[in-house]
Amino acid sequence: VLKKIEEFEREGKFDVDVEEDPPTIVLTPENIDYLREKMSSKIKRIFANEMGERFLDNLLKNNKLIIKQVNGIENLNKVKTGALITCNHFNPFDCFTVEKVFRMSENEKDKRLYKVIREGNYTNFPGLYGFFFRNCDTLPLSSNKRTMVNFMKAVDTILQKGDYILIYPEQ
């Protein structure tokens, strides 16, 4: 992947994905409840976030994820409006780290952290990780234009509510 990044950078291909992802199932508007308005979506969100929090705490407790230090949390504490959060991203555990830092912040009690994810992460993953990808306050992108209109409306609503959205630069 790193060699491909260098190659695409030299060639000016900044909009081409360097990862060779498997084909994905297209996410259509009727298959996503971005704002968790349906009762079933709300219940799954609560359950998934509780399971996800326990999973993260277990990773930290067993030293499978180590966060050596956190710099700049005071800046996050000052943000009182909706905000987009971004960071460098190369490891699947990056999302867990950002989630933990968010939970350490003063805003954790009255704000929610949504995560923008790839379409394939939402539609293709089976099992526990798939359940998390579909229900832990995720906002999947889509190759379907109608779905993306709904995505943008949801982003606007979330930011207007004062919540946060994590998006990685490569998305």
Question: Where are each of the predicted segments found?
Answer:
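Soluble catalytic domains of membrane acyltransferases
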Residues: 66-171
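Membrane-interfacial terminal anchoring regions of lipid-handling membrane enzymes
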Residues: 1-83, 90-91, 157-161
